[in-house]
Regions:
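Short, surface-exposed helix-loop/turn micro-motifs enriched in polar/charged residues
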Residues: 60, 169-172, 190
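Short helix/loop capping segments that flank catalytic or ligand/cofactor-binding pockets
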Residues: 29, 79, 132-133, 207-208
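Small-aliphatic-rich amphipathic alpha-helix that forms the alpha element of a beta-alpha
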Residues: 42, 68, 120-133, 139-182
Length: 208
């Protein structure tokens, strides 16, 4: 489609513009560890609370169905394992110790070769069945739709944080649901489905 009224040229003279211009998807990482402070900030950016008691991401009727799980690999000051992030308290509660990155990689369709080498990953999950019943005044599909929208909002927050900090990430949503159910059992909350994986680490080379 062509034609129409021309808009003013974008000047790209503010901080958000520069962050958006540097946003990339990264699938190759170095083995450099991340700091616990970096991980804390990443988790807050994805799912944290603000000083007004709200969250950093919007949620339909403030239901906040998305759970955030950290899979820690090479993080200075934090043992390998899976940790559930509690945003109100800004704390981590371990769900399984040891290196869980290979198990998470099994859930992906095309990241099994490189995901186990990422220093960390954030898992986004939700009880989708419960979400379908959460809005009785609307069709059940709306509850599930809201969940997916909120996954996108959380992922975009992660992208913006990563772009500002020079950290690499990518949203992995191409998942094998059956394998994910088995490999992530005990890592994410009971009855939750894995909806997205956000690897985190130092980019090894230019991303797209």
């Amino acid at each position: 489609m062509t034609g129409g009224d021309a808009l003013p040229a974008i000047q790209h003279d503010d901080r958000l513009d520069h962050i958006l211009l540097s946003r990339r998807s990264t699938k190759q990482f170095t083995d450099s560890p991340l700091s616990l402070a970096e991980i804390a900030h990443a988790l807050w950016t994805v799912a944290g609370t603000t000083t007004a008691g709200h969250r950093v991401g919007a949620s339909a009727r403030a239901t906040y169905p998305i759970a955030t799980t950290l899979v820690a690999g090479e993080i200075d000051g934090l043992a390998m394992g899976a940790y559930l992030y509690h945003p109100v308290e800004h704390t981590l509660v371990i769900t399984r110790s040891g290196d869980q990155r290979p198990a998470v990689a099994e859930a992906s369709l095309d990241a099994a070769s490189w995901l186990p080498g990422c220093p960390a990953a954030i898992l986004l999950s939700a009880d989708v069945a419960a979400a379908r019943e959460r809005f009785p005044d609307q069709p059940a599909v709306h509850g599930e739709r809201f969940v997916w929208i909120e996954v996108g909002l959380a992922a975009q927050n992660a992208y913006l944080w990563a772009a500002e900090r020079g950290v690499g990430t990518v949203l992995l949503a191409g998942l094998d649901d059956e394998r994910a159910t088995g490999s992530c059992r005990g890592l994410i909350p009971h009855r939750h489905e894995l909806l997205g994986i956000l690897p985190l680490g130092e980019p090894a080379q230019s991303a797209s």
